[in-house]
Amino acid sequence: MINSGRLSVPSWLVDSPLNTPDADSFAGQMVPGAPMDDAPVSGGQSPWLLRHFGNQFQLLVYANDASQLSAAQVQELAALAQGPVPIHTTVVAQSGQAPAPLATLIDVQGAVAQRYDLQPGSCYLLRPDQHVAARWRQFDAAKVRAALARATGNA
């Protein structure tokens, strides 16, 4: 019996019309349409990034200190979860805890920041199948909603 699951690799969907093309400059392989890269994290139920993503649209937001997000930022990010297609936010940070209702993961080795070319304020819209739908250097709720509409075929 052959375990073909070990031989499979995620598809790269870089030519999909559901992706939002980059408007900002990024290095690395985490382009729209790329499958997410895994990395070690702490602060959640699993020590691996990928275990915290999937089965829903999610926004990964990067911060140096998650506790330093402003009340306005938290309110805007939390509002994304109230839309017709909810987007749940997870803050990945070097330290700190984001205010509720946002989830926080700590980038213990800096691997998430390196693999995703993250700077404070960078954010990634991630699809339920753990592929990158869009990414920006700074959070903009209107751009996130437009990328969600495109990713769901409603643009």
Which residue ranges define each predicted feature?
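Helical substrate-recognition/capping region of FAD-dependent monooxygenase/halogenase enzymes
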Residues: 1-155
